[in-house]
Amino acid sequence: MSTSFENKATNRGVITFTISQDKIKPALDKAFNKIKKDLNAPGFRKGHMPRPVFNQKFGEEVLYEDALNIVLPEAYEAAVTELGLDVVAQPKIDVVSMEKGKEWTLSAEVVTKPEVKLGDYKNLVVEVDASKEVSDEDVDAKIERERQNLAELIIKDGEAAQGDTVVIDFVGSVDGVEFDGGKGDNFSLELGSGQFIPGFEDQLVGAKAGDEVEVNVTFPESYQAEDLAGKAAKFMTTIHEVKTKEVPELDDELAKDIDEDVDTLEDLKVKYRKELEAAQETAYDDAVEGAAIELAVANAEIVDLPEEMIHEEVNRSVNEFMGNMQRQGISPEMYFQLTGTTQEDLHNQYSAEADKRVKTNLVIEAIAKAEGFEATDSEIEQEINDLATEYNMPADQVRSLLSADMLKHDIAMKKAVEVITSTASVK
């Protein structure tokens, strides 16, 4: 293989590389065997056409595209490695020449990782809007949340108030015509929860079981159903039940209901204080780490960050998000309909975060390189065991999912983050 690289602009260039016949011939054989079973020729059973007959009838050139797809990935990676390039986006491949019996020549337009000029990243002084302190009010608030979670809904003989739950039937119409999705039966609605269109819940305050209420609202201009956006609607609403929350007394019995490992309310407060202090400590450390990394990135200069890196990160984030949606049974079409957004809106939503994440990774990688951080065998093994514990899977499965290079990269990145944060101080 012969390779060359022509620089076209900052972080951009063209690789030219060749593929030898000793690689091409086996690929042509594979391409032929792939289609052989479907070939017919007079005098031969289906799937038994000899290669010379095929070449004479169709020409060997018809196999070139499939053969190229077989040999290209390995040949391209070998060229990148030989040239010592750090390519960061999908290449644009072009065929320069593909002649029978000769080596093939291809070109690849590539984008390379930008130069990072590091600034200060050690002994940084940062400000954080976080505290390690836990107050009595914090403990009481946590207990109150648990107390509210244990509340029971009981039938209320009287008017509905904010915070009460009403069980309703409703039928919505616009200009006297009912619309899809505007009807519900025995729907439980907590007043003040904001589940329904603004103004809907407020008009049920004061209603009693058995009442029929005409609720008049206007759909927001940004409503996901475009045919309803900005339109006035009427909902004929029947109140079946009014329910109110009955919360348990704040006493030792409540404490035992919340946590079976405590005997008194005071025990629960002590336990919750320890939990909150641990959580606050973690949140504080995370805030310091985030602020220090952000400052280290701000102190660095990234020379001509390629847009392709941002686009790839946005696409990765969007694909991950939509994959999570589909695992919950929500298709892309359904998501965009429910949210009233578009594919472009979703990409724009992730763009700013993608830009920040790409720059952060580049700077941390540059710090790891500047410090000469590498991973030892024992550190790799420890990382595998830690991941196995975190994701509750066998260590061998982790090894099969992650390459040694990926693990080495992650460990070096962690060491770089550690050198930033361990030397940082809070103003």
UniProtKB/Swiss-Prot annotation:
Enzyme class name: isomerase
Domain PPIase FKBP-type: 163-248
HAMAP family: Trigger_factor_Tig
GO MF annotations, alphabetized: peptidyl-prolyl cis-trans isomerase activity; protein folding chaperone; ribosome binding
One Gene Ontology term, aspect cellular component: cytoplasm
Domain notes: Consists of 3 domains; the N-terminus binds the ribosome, the middle domain has PPIase activity, while the C-terminus has intrinsic chaperone activity on its own.
GO biological process: 'de novo' cotranslational protein folding; cell division; chaperone-mediated protein folding; protein transport; protein unfolding
Source organism per UniProt: Streptococcus pyogenes serotype M1
Subcellular localization, as worded in the UniProt entry: Cytoplasm
Disulfides per UniProt: none
EC number: 5.2.1.8
Family, similarity comment: Belongs to the FKBP-type PPIase family. Tig subfamily.
Catalyzed reactions per annotation: [protein]-peptidylproline (omega=180) = [protein]-peptidylproline (omega=0)
Record field: transmembrane: none
Main location group: cytoplasm
Upper taxonomic lineage: Bacteria, Bacillati, Bacillota, Bacilli, Lactobacillales
Function: Involved in protein export. Acts as a chaperone by maintaining the newly synthesized protein in an open conformation. Functions as a peptidyl-prolyl cis-trans isomerase.
Alphabetic keyword roster: Cell cycle, Cell division, Chaperone, Cytoplasm, Isomerase, Rotamase
Record's protein name: Trigger factor
